[in-house]
Amino acid sequence: MAKLTSAVPVLTARDVAGAVEFWTDRLGFSRDFVEDDFAGVVRDDVTLFISAVQDQVVPDNTLAWVWVRGLDELYAEWSEVVSTNFRDASGPAMTEIGEQPWGREFALRDPAGNCVHFVAEEQD
């Protein structure tokens, strides 16, 4: 029987190189591949693709969810390099950790405007 084994969110950005730099230099991802208008970054078992777009409406409406072991540790790590003032910050920012119907999470907005939610796995 066939078994699905993973999925890769595709984030969008008007500046792919700048987005890759943010995810790698500030958030600890590694470059998997980088083309002119498409890239992949990896951290642990998570891969994110970044695709070029011309219209800012696309990244402003892109959402993804990533499940995490060690949510509190990840939040502490990233809060040293990303603003935690999500509502007032105009660039990259994170929300505080909060409880949602699907679990504890925080959201991160990257420089392109993508919003990625990081959710604690149940054993956290």
Curated annotation (Swiss-Prot):
Homodimer. Binding protein with a strong affinity to the bleomycin family of antibiotics. CDD domains: BLMA_like. Keywords: Antibiotic resistance. InterPro entries: Bleomycin-R, Glyas_Bleomycin-R_OHBP_Dase, VOC. This is Bleomycin resistance protein. Residues 3-121 form the VOC domain. The lineage of its organism: Bacteria, Bacillati, Actinomycetota, Actinomycetes, Pseudonocardiales. PROSITE patterns: VOC. Belongs to the bleomycin resistance protein family. NCBIfam families: ble_BLMA_gen, ble_Sh. The keyword Transferase does not apply. The gene is ble. One of its GO terms (biological process) is response to antibiotic. Gene3D superfamilies: 2,3-Dihydroxybiphenyl 1,2-Dioxygenase, domain 1 (3.10.180.10).
